[in-house]
């Protein structure tokens, strides 16, 4: 019984002694390692030999890509390892002490910085402890939020792929003193970004020579390759622009008498201008290249602007004053003949009026009125017009090929009317009939002028309809060509649509 209790107490005492000895070993080791240690001294056994530093990084997150300021913000953990000749110990002399940690500034560490840093402090890393094991192997893992300058190529925006470089190197050591070796980047803990897809982060070791020195200056450059996800921009910019450009085609379908053709065209043009300003706020103020979406907006604005100009011409044709003159011959041939035939358009009422005129090509002329004073004394019922109508009973219509005939209405050609006005006179003994004939001539002349004005107006209105239909087809083709040709010219258009819109 006593022997069992004695064994327990001995085991407990041995454990406490081991813990106290381990703490004592670690304390003594720290004192031995930092004794006569100079953090400014390069820890190598031979000063003529370079110190090899292995460098890598772990990309955790792409936080922001500022296209306007051309700055990439990333969350990165750096990984640096080297061997310190002065921080080695024999584990048998310090049992239980496998590794020790030194704070920043107490031991030597490489001054590796991000060359293309855009941070106000330049060095954005959090200085952590350096982990050292018994063989002198040192491991330094400082995390940081890095802001690096990156040239943003907006040529294919929003179907663009960006490549941002992260260039790391020693700030004061050359290649003969510090040999910087690259290791592959780690993206196993990467957090996906809602705007960018990470395609890869390949690295490359470079050596650069300066005129001042013969030794090389090595650096490690990692290229962050990322593809923009286009779903957001497609729903908020591209699709509204396509719909607005389609609305611009409705200008040619809107009747000219509605009075809203110009208003609709200008409204569409202003809408595209607003979207253009939204794109300009995102893009950097650079003249190196024009973004793809800006090209599409500009081409659409040009098409809409031309549609407004054509609408003005259409309205001018539609509301043309008949007293302003007849349609020029070349305009009639091009618009009313060629374009109307190509568009399969016919004048309103053309199929109804022309056959009737062809079957009854008759014209009534005042010259055919036979006035016979010798037929007997004129009888009167007390109405002056009755005498006139009695005199017009002999009026008849004769067939004539003249195009001035108006079917269903009494019409007289200008030559016949002038002949009647100057050469045809009734009998000298019937002044009432002469007055009636003069009134008939006036009425016929008014009808003829109205018919001519209606023909001129109908020609101009039909020409306006032809221009509207022709521009509707032409602008539809141009809009489709611009939409497909410009947007599909992006190298990764198919990949972006298949991945983001699927």
UniProtKB/Swiss-Prot annotation:
List the subcellular locations. Postsynaptic cell membrane; Cell membrane
Enumerate the residue ranges of region (Essential for TMEM35A/NACHO-mediated proper subunit assembly and trafficking to cell membrane). 260-267
Q: What does UniProt note about where in the body, tissue by tissue, this protein is expressed?
A: Expressed in neurons. Expressed in umbrella cells of urothelium (at protein level).
What is the protein's major site of localization? Answer: membrane
| Glycan-bearing residues | 46, 90, 133
Residues the record lists as binding Ca(2+): 42, 44, 172, 210
* Catalytic activity reported: Ca(2+)(in) = Ca(2+)(out); K(+)(in) = K(+)(out); Na(+)(in) = Na(+)(out); choline(out) = choline(in)
Explain the post-translational modification. Glycosylations at Asn-46, Asn-90 and Asn-133 are essential for TMEM35A/NACHO-mediated proper subunit assembly and trafficking to the cell membrane.
Q: Which domain of life is it from?
A: Eukaryota
Give all cystine bridges in this chain.
150-164, 212-213
Q: How would you describe this protein's topology in the membrane?
A: Multi-pass membrane protein
| GO cellular component terms, A-Z | acetylcholine-gated channel complex; apical plasma membrane; asymmetric synapse; axolemma; axon; cation channel complex; cholinergic synapse; dendrite
Question: Which residue intervals are topologically Extracellular?
Answer: 23-233
Secretion signal span: 1-22
- Activity regulation behaviour: Activated by a myriad of ligands such as acetylcholine, cytisine, nicotine, choline and epibatidine. Oligomeric amyloid-beta protein 42 activates specifially CHRNA7:CHRNB2 nAchRs. Activity is modulated by positive allosteric modulators (PAMs), such as flavonoids, with a wide range of chemical diversity, pharmacological sensitivity and efficacy. AChR activity is inhibited by the antagonists alpha-conotoxons RgIA, ImI and ImII, small disulfide-constrained peptides from cone snails. Alpha-conotoxin PnIC selectively inhibits CHRNA7:CHRNB2 over CHRNA7 homopentamer.
One GO biological process from the UniProt record? Answer: positive regulation of gene expression
Q: What is the role of the protein in this entry?
A: Component of neuronal acetylcholine receptors (nAChRs) that function as pentameric, ligand-gated cation channels with high calcium permeability among other activities. nAChRs are excitatory neurotrasnmitter receptors formed by a collection of nAChR subunits known to mediate synaptic transmission in the nervous system and the neuromuscular junction. Each nAchR subunit confers differential attributes to channel properties, including activation, deactivation and desensitization kinetics, pH sensitivity, cation permeability, and binding to allosteric modulators.
Provide the assembly information: Homopentamer. Can also form heteropentamers with CHRNB2, mainly found in basal forebrain cholinergic neurons. Interacts with RIC3; which is required for proper folding and assembly. Interacts with LYPD6. Interacts with CANX.
Enumerate the PANTHER family for this protein.
NEUROTRANSMITTER GATED ION CHANNEL (PTHR18945)
Q: Kindly provide the name given to this protein in its UniProt entry.
A: Neuronal acetylcholine receptor subunit alpha-7
């Amino acid at each position: 019984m006593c022997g069992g209790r004695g064994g327990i107490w001995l085991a407990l005492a041995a454990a406490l002694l081991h813990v106290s000895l381990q703490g004592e070993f670690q304390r003594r080791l720290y004192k031995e390692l930092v004794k006569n240690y100079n953090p400014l001294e390069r820890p190598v056994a031979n000063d003529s030999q370079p110190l090899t530093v292995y460098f890598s990084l772990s990309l955790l997150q792409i936080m922001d890509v500022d296209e306007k300021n051309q700055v990439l913000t990333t969350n990165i953990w750096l990984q640096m390892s080297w061997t310190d000749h002065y921080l080695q110990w024999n584990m048998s002399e310090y049992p239980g002490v496998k590794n020790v940690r030194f704070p920043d500034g107490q031991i030597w560490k490489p001054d590796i910085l991000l060359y293309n840093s855009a941070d106000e402090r330049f060095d954005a890393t959090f200085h952590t402890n350096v982990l050292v094991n018994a063989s002198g192997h040192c491991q330094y893992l400082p995390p940081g939020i890095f802001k690096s300058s990156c040239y943003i190529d907006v040529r294919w925006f929003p179907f663009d792929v960006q490549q941002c470089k992260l260039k790391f190197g020693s700030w004061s050591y050359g290649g003969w003193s510090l040999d910087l070796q690259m290791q592959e980047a780690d993206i196993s803990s990467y957090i996906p970004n809602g705007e960018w897809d990470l395609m890869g982060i390949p690295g490359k070791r470079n050596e650069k020579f300066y005129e001042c020195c013969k030794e090389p200056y090595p650096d490690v450059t990692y290229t962050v390759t990322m593809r923009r996800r286009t779903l957001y921009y497609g729903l908020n910019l591209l699709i509204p622009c396509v719909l607005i450009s389609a609305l611009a085609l409705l200008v040619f379908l809107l009747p000219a008498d509605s009075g809203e053709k110009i208003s609709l065209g200008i409204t569409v043009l202003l809408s595209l201008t607003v979207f253009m300003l939204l794109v300009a706020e995102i893009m950097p103020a650079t003249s190196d290249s024009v973004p793809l979406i800006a090209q599409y907006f500009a081409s659409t604005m040009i098409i809409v602007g031309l549609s407004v100009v054509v609408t003005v011409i259409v309205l001018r044709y539609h509301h043309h004053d008949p007293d302003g003159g007849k349609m020029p011959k070349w305009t009639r041939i091009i618009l009313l003949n060629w374009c109307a035939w190509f568009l399969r358009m016919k004048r309103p009422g053309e199929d109804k009026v022309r056959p009737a005129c062809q079957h009854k090509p008759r014209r009534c002329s005042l010259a055919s009125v036979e006035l016979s004073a010798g037929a007997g004394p004129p009888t009167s019922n007390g109405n002056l017009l009755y005498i006139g109508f009695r005199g017009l009973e002999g009026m008849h219509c004769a067939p004539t090929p003249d195009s001035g005939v108006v079917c269903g209405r009494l019409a007289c050609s200008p030559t016949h009317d002038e002949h009647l006005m100057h050469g045809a006179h009734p009998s000298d003994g019937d002044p009432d009939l002469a007055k009636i004939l003069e009134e008939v001539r006036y009425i016929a002349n008014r009808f003829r002028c109205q018919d001519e004005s209606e023909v001129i107006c109908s020609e101009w209105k039909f020409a306006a309809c032809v221009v509207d239909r022709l521009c509707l087809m032409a602008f539809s083709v141009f809009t489709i060509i611009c939409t497909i040709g410009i947007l599909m010219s992006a190298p990764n258009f198919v990949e972006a649509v298949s991945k983001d819109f699927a």
